[in-house]
Design a protein with these regions (language model features):
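N-terminal first-folded block
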Residues: 1-34
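C-terminal structural segments of small proteins and small subunits
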Residues: 58-88
Length: 88
């Protein structure tokens, strides 16, 4: 699967669409230039955002601290920056 991204000053930026409260957790694929992700956590008090960061950290092999939601923290559509990566 080719994940669309763009380069930023410190790493890369991804557009992500999350589906919280799913029966399973994982990367579901790509739709256009957006990564589709299913999460089991509810969208309450940042639980889904935390699980998204954890999942991306595991899948991409980067530290959780290098991943930041820069837009859409209260939305299903998010923009995520991953510092220290140049490509996927």
């Amino acid at each position: 699967m080719r994940i669309p991204f763009r380069k930023s000053k410190d790493g890369i930026v991804l557009a992500v669409r999350v589906q919280p409260r799913s029966s399973k957790r994982g990367i579901e694929g790509v739709s256009g230039d957006t990564l589709k992700v299913k999460l089991t956590a509810p969208p309450h008090e940042g639980a889904a955002n935390e699980q998204l960061i954890e999942l991306l950290s595991e899948e991409l092999g980067v530290r959780k601290g290098s991943i930041k939601i820069i837009k859409g923290s209260g939305s299903r559509n998010k923009v995520v920056e991953i510092k220290g990566l140049e490509t996927l």
